[in-house]
Amino acid sequence: MPLGPTCGPVLLLGSTWFTVGSTTPVERWVTVERGQPLFLVLVSMIGCLADACMDGEGKCQAGYGVGDEALADYLRDGIRTCNDVSTAELYATVDSHPLGNLFQYRAWSPQPFAWWYPAGSIVAGGDEAGGELPLAVTDGWYLLLAPLSPGEHVVRYGAKCVNPDDPSIWCTAILLYHITVK
């Protein structure tokens, strides 16, 4: 599915819709079936073993090999620390009703995983060929919303993140979904 201002959830897994995140403000319109929960990504960071990290002997510059659990821990610690110091605010509303205590919904991948990315993706530099990263971990804040009642709904969510080295540099992810439940 192409990404653009009007595309909606990218994946239906079982009965759950997984919505597309963004690092810039975006507005989307989607239709879902009655009874389908929605999975929202407030903030997510992926730590992965990129080809640029590898030397000629299959070792990361940090000294770990692809199969080392220590490498997964190293990546996990790095993204966890980055999220800790950079995530300033989280917010989510459903039909103008704020959802509270969002920082309690943090989760991370307990096991490393391989990650495939398509050509033209952010990971691929926008227009390069896609590929697979043999080891990745993730850390962030996620919400699983109970199925919404039939009708029209507005779900707004996102985060404000800051650069701890220069607080004048910050980004705000504002996602606005207009959802029709059939």
Predicted regions and their residues:
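N-terminal segment immediately downstream of the Sec signal-peptide cleavage site
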Residues: 1-17, 173, 180-182
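Extracellular-facing segments of soluble proteins and assemblies that are Gly/Ser/Thr-biased and enriched
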Residues: 12-120
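Beta-strand-connecting loops/turns
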Residues: 35, 150-151
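Extended, well-structured beta-strand/loop surface patches
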Residues: 85-150, 156-182
